[in-house]
Swiss-Prot record:
Swiss-Prot/TrEMBL GO biological process terms: cellular response to oxidative stress; hydrogen peroxide catabolic process; response to reactive oxygen species
Site (Transition state stabilizer): 35
Classification lineage: Eukaryota, Fungi, Dikarya, Ascomycota, Pezizomycotina
Record PANTHER family: L-ASCORBATE PEROXIDASE 3, THYLAKOID LUMENAL 29 KDA PROTEIN, CHLOROPLASTIC-RELATED
PROSITE patterns assigned: PEROXIDASE_1, PEROXIDASE_2, PEROXIDASE_4
Organism of origin: Pyricularia oryzae (strain 70-15 / ATCC MYA-4617 / FGSC 8958) (Rice blast fungus)
Similarity field: Belongs to the peroxidase family. Cytochrome c peroxidase subfamily.
Cofactor details (free text): Binds 1 heme b (iron(II)-protoporphyrin IX) group per subunit.
Region (Disordered): 44-64, 116-135
GO MF term list: heme binding; metal ion binding; peroxidase activity
Protein name per its UniProtKB record: Putative heme-binding peroxidase
Annotated active site: 39 (proton acceptor), 179 (tryptophan radical intermediate)
Length: 300
């Protein structure tokens, strides 16, 4: 039975109920939902005030088919039953709320979230491709991408802590493996591992991309880091915050909650009462996500 419009608690409960996915990566949809929320907002450009979390642009090929969003068709499909039960919620609200709920359900901080996003009526407002981070790059690229969105160095490192969740797949990003031992539990282990392990270069079979790996002596797990991850330790300003978050998980959680909230609000204009006033959008209807599959792929 459909919920009453505005019953976001009911939506939250349904999101939590779908996180357990035994046939999917590490048995959880949580990490890919966080990635979906992140990529939905990470297209923002403050200089042109374009992109951001409004519009649900991944419903269109121009954004949904971006190679940087490969694999996110699974996240979008996970959320379709929730959308069906709560047809009043926009895709833009649902996809950002799902990321916030997933972080909390996986042991992370409570992140503020505000409703009111609308869905693009067509693809004319979809931002251009190329705005998401290129993991093969270094600190200069990381700053270019995140400064464009309006983040500072501390916020960049805090947001990078989301790599405590999930794993990479060669067919999606060209990289392979997980960052931490338990990729479905939000923690500061990402920062601890960045500084404690002897990371050695490895070429990913089939893609030729360079990443860095280390073997956990206790569990035998092979863990990995991306070039952009290691740039956080080679750059002195970034490295300072890596050390801070390594030593203080509570501070990391507090900072992450603030900066993820900021990320989810990129591109959103609100009036004094908090109502979204982006004039170029309407309450959009359903548009099938590009490359939508009949069955969710567990190994990509």
């Amino acid at each position: 039975m459909a919920s009453k419009p505005g019953d976001f608690d009911a939506v939250r409960k349904d999101i939590v109920s779908l996180l357990d996915q035994p046939e999917y990566d590490d048995g959880s949809a949580g990490p890919v939902l966080v990635r979906l929320a992140w990529h939905s907002a990470g297209t923002y450009d403050k200089s042109t005030d374009t992109g951001g979390s409004n519009g649900a642009g991944m419903r269109y090929e121009a954004e949904g088919g971006d190679p940087a969003n490969a694999g996110l068709q699974n996240a979008r499909q996970f959320l379709e039953p929730v959308k069906a039960r709560h047809p009043w919620i926009t895709y833009a609200d649902l996809r950002t709320l799902a990321g916030v709920v997933a972080v909390r359900a996986m042991g992370g901080p409570e992140i503020p979230w505000r409703a009111g996003r609308t869905d693009f009526a067509d693809d004319s407002r979809v931002p251009p491709r190329g705005r998401l981070p290129d993991a093969t790059q270094g600190a200069a690229h990381v700053r270019d991408i995140f400064y464009r969105m309006g983040f500072d160095d501390r916020e960049i490192v805090a947001l990078s802590g989301a790599h405590s969740l999930g794993r990479c797949h060669p067919a999606n990003s060209g990289f392979e493996g997980k960052w931490v031992n338990n990729p479905t539990r939000f923690s500061n282990q990402y920062f601890r591992l960045l500084l404690s392990e002897d990371w050695r270069e490895k070429t990913v079979a089939g893609t030729g991309l360079k990443q860095f790996v280390a073997v956990d002596e206790v569990t035998g797990d092979e863990l990995m880091m991306l070039p952009t991850d290691l740039s956080l330790t080679s750059d002195p300003v970034f490295a300072r915050w890596v050390k801070v978050y390594r030593d203080d998980q509570d501070l990391f959680f507090a900072d992450f909650a603030k900066v993820f909230d900021k990320l989810m609000e990129l591109g959103i204009k609100r009036d004094a009462e908090g109502k979204v006033i982006n004039k170029e959008n309407v309450e959009g209807g359903y548009v099938s996500a590009p490359k939508k599959q009949g069955k969710i792929a567990s190994k990509l």
